[in-house]
Amino acid sequence: LDVQIVFEDGSLAVLNKPANMVVHPVKSSQSGTLVNFLIFKYRDTLPIIYDKFRPGIVHRLDKDTSGLIIVAKTKLSADSLIKQFKSRKVKKVYLALCIGNPLENLSKIIGKPGINMLEDNILEIKTNIRRNKINREMMEVCTNDGRLAISRFTVQTVYDLGKNYKLSLVSCEIETGRT
């Protein structure tokens, strides 16, 4: 499996999870998961987090997301990391390459409930979301139920590729872990 170990000591490992890799085995994807890698690499030495399918895993990344994932190697580090993620002491920042320039369309969304422009051109979206009742893989904004999602976006660079085609490098800070 194509998983790079970026850092490792006696307490934890930081892994670079590639995009399109499922973290936990599911019915449609039993092999090639991050859990499969962890079981192969560390055998039975990782602490069990919640159940046997989370060996050392204290947070998650979606299948389509590449990035760093922290794996606890001891019960003590697992407890500490889980506490830090729950209390939001860990800052989660992603980079995304987007089609177009989000700043050009802000007038269409600024002022809608939960959408605010903060200083330094930071766009904050703070609203409740829930799973779409028809397509359970999608999330939707809702007003009276769901769970709070807080995300902040900053356009880092806009690449003008000509012929009215632009790409933007956007920094995304996910405060709640829900998007």
Where do the protein language model's features map onto the residues?
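RNA pseudouridine synthases
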Residues: 1-179
